[in-house]
Regions:
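Flexible, low-complexity charged segments
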Residues: 1-101
Length: 101
C-alpha cells in the first residue's frame, strides 16, 4: 500500500558557489509511512524547513546537476528529516520542481 504524500514546501535558495549569485528553486513533496507521520510533518514544518534550507544552501551548482546529484539530494534530505521524526518516517522525497540559475 502506498502511503500518503505531504508538501514539504517551496524553497528559493542562494547556492554556495563563491563569488557567484547562483540560485536554486525547489518544490519538495514526500511520501510518508503512515497518516500519523503526515500530522507530525505538518506540525514540525519550521524544523523541517530549517533543515532543508541548511542543506540546500550548502550545495554548489555542480552538486545539483545530473541524475546522480538529484538522487543524493533526495537521500540526504530524507535522512535529515527522518532524524527528527518520532512517529514514523519519510519513505520517499520527490523533487516536483528543481531549477538552478
Amino acid at each position: 500500500e502506498v502511503g500518503p504524500t505531504v508538501d514539504i514546501g517551496t524553497f528559493s535558495i542562494t547556492l554556495a558557489d563563491p563569488g557567484q549569485n547562483r540560485f536554486l528553486k525547489a518544490i519538495l513533496k514526500a511520501r510518508v509511512s503512515a497518516s500519523s507521520v503526515l500530522e507530525e510533518v505538518e506540525g514540525r514544518e519550521p524544523e523541517i524547513r530549517d533543515r532543508v534550507i541548511d542543506y540546500l544552501s550548502s550545495l554548489t551548482v555542480k552538486e545539483t546537476q545530473g541524475a546522480a546529484a538529484k538522487s543524493a539530494i533526495r537521500g540526504n534530505l530524507k535522512k535529515r528529516i527522518n532524524n527528527i521524526l518520532r512517529t514514523g518516517e519519510l519513505e520517499s522525497i520527490f523533487l516536483t520542481e528543481f531549477v538552478t540559475q
